[in-house]
Amino acid sequence: MLSKRIIPCLDVKDGVVVKGVQFRNHEVMGGIVELARRYASEGADELVFYDITASSDERVVDKSWVSRVAEVIDIPFCVAGGIKSVEDARQILEFGADKVSINSPALADPTLITRLAERFGVQCVVVGIDSYFDAQSGHYQVKQFTGDESRTRTTAWHTLDWVEEAQKRGAGEIVLNVMNQDGMRQGYDLEQLKLVRAVCKVPLIASGGAGAMEHFRDAFTLADVDGALAASVFHKGLIPIPELKRWLKTEGVAIRE
């Protein structure tokens, strides 16, 4: 059985790590390199960095900190933010990232997923999906440009359809960001994760809503996700990673020490 992954998520804006609630009202959490070093030493399995305004600002992720992070940690890390071309991805991978994640640019040009997968291998290509439950329609919809409230828009894609399309085009991993739950610390959206799991044949990472150790366990055992991503509970020290991993092990979850 493959070990489940615990993945701190670091949203980057203006050169520092920030965290909002439902993608709004961001507050500063700390320095990029300092937090990366801390999480690596605490036993995180992987890190994900989102330059949250890169796509909405129409620029690519700032690479200066990517190489600094690569120098100080020895765990895999993934970088996202405005990656629109094979060349953008090549530079980020050359600076030391292990994976690139694409979100809004993949929605604008789905062929980007295939081009990246063919050039670097599917194991390097993550597709991030910002999914929002629209209570009026009863559908899970995919949102775009979520780093900037003024530019955020609902796409024509239903979440499950986009998950299937992204896989067909070569996504090696899916990160499902559940916008309704983001920063609320009420638990992952297990119902949506189960629906996505049923159509997702590549590794699936849950994101949005972790607030207690039980939430991680439930995502792993009830929705069968491969990794659980969280931000505020780690940044604010509410759940220490070593403690979380020890507890998950006692709950029967296959976890790396």
From Swiss-Prot:
Catalysis performed (reactions): 5-[(5-phospho-1-deoxy-D-ribulos-1-ylimino)methylamino]-1-(5-phospho-beta-D-ribosyl)imidazole-4-carboxamide + L-glutamine = D-erythro-1-(imidazol-4-yl)glycerol 3-phosphate + 5-amino-1-(5-phospho-beta-D-ribosyl)imidazole-4-carboxamide + L-glutamate + H(+)
InterPro entries reported for this sequence: Aldolase_TIM (IPR013785), His_biosynth (IPR006062), HisF (IPR004651), IGPS_HisA/HisF (IPR050064), RibuloseP-bd_barrel (IPR011060)
Active site (catalytic residues): D11, D130
Enzyme class: lyase
Keyword Iron carried by entry: no
Domain of life: Bacteria
Any one GO CC term of the record: cytoplasm
Metabolic or biological pathway, per its Swiss-Prot or TrEMBL entry: Amino-acid biosynthesis; L-histidine biosynthesis; L-histidine from 5-phospho-alpha-D-ribose 1-diphosphate: step 5/9
A Pfam entry, by short name: His_biosynth
GO biological process: one example: L-histidine biosynthetic process
Subcellular compartments: Cytoplasm
EC number: 4.3.2.10
Main location: cytoplasm
Record carries keyword Protein biosynthesis: no
Purpose: IGPS catalyzes the conversion of PRFAR and glutamine to IGP, AICAR and glutamate. The HisF subunit catalyzes the cyclization activity that produces IGP and AICAR from PRFAR using the ammonia provided by the HisH subunit.
HAMAP family for this protein: HisF
Subunit and partners: Heterodimer of HisH and HisF.
Family in the record: Belongs to the HisA/HisF family.
Protein name: Imidazole glycerol phosphate synthase subunit HisF
